[in-house]
Regions:
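Flexible "arm" and connector segments at domain edges
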Residues: 1-105
Length: 105
């Protein structure tokens, strides 16, 4: 891996592979499905004590594709989503509310 993509470069390249209709439904359900596949690998790790890192990495790539396409469908760049998330987490850290639950903490 010599050439590393930025989030936005990845998103633009991934958009060229998107061939679906009903964008929000397809990408939302696809994201849930791929996240479930990651969870399945973790479940098998708990059961068997072995984790196939490459298989999980490939599934994370699928998760990333769906996140990128969902962001595009909502007219956001991945870098904007990343910045919004870091702003939220930074605010929680400043307020001492990283732990706990709920979006508005």
């Amino acid at each position: 891996m010599t050439n590393k993509l930025t989030l936005d470069q990845y998103q633009k390249a991934a958009e060229k592979t998107a061939i679906y209709t009903d964008a929000l439904v397809y990408t939302g359900l696809g994201l849930a499905g791929e996240a479930g596949e990651v969870a399945d690998h973790i479940k098998k790790f708990l059961r068997d004590g072995e984790l196939n890192h490459e298989a999980v990495a490939k599934e994370l790539g699928d998760v990333l594709w769906y996140v990128a396409m969902l962001a595009s469908d909502l007219e956001y760049d991945l870098s904007e989503i990343a910045q919004m998330n870091m702003d939220k987490l930074s605010g929680r850290h400043t307020r001492g509310t990283i732990g706990g639950s709920g979006d508005e903490r």
